[in-house]
Amino acid sequence: MSRGLGDVYKRQAVQLACDKITKEEIEEMKKAAEDFKKILKSKDITEIAEADVRFHDIIYMATDNQKLIQLLNNLREQMYRYRVEYLKREEAHPQLIAEHAAIIEYISKGEKKAATDIMCKHIDNQVTTVIDVIRTKQN
């Protein structure tokens, strides 16, 4: 279900991160995922969204590909709106935590296919939720 250039860029970022990520960046991802988990308890959607952005930014920076990072940054505002809608659904939070853990695991092991698959699932879940929100608002 993934669609759009942003999805393509994110998949590329995950694949490059599998090749280039450092031990320090893996530790940063783990810390960002833990911070995200803690911030979820605050129910402050802005803080939660910013914590999620920090997690994904570590992946993007790990690519060491300035052009790709720039392209993803250009899409940041559009992606942020969708992210906020998704993060408002508290029932999705346990799944997000699990997906972040799986992304860390597969990137740290350099398992490109598994990392890409989980990132696609992560994106698809967000897209599906946003579509549901739009449909609900229309009715």
Annotated model-derived regions:
Residues 20-85, 98-106, 114-125:
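Conserved amphipathic alpha-helical segments that form helical-bundle/coiled-coil interaction surfaces
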Residues 91-94:
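Active-site loop of classical SDR/Rossmann-like NAD(P)-dependent oxidoreductases
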Residues 135-139:
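…primarily DNA-binding HTH/wHTH and HhH modules…
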Residues 1-6:
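Single conserved hydrophobic/aromatic residue that forms the stacking wall/gate
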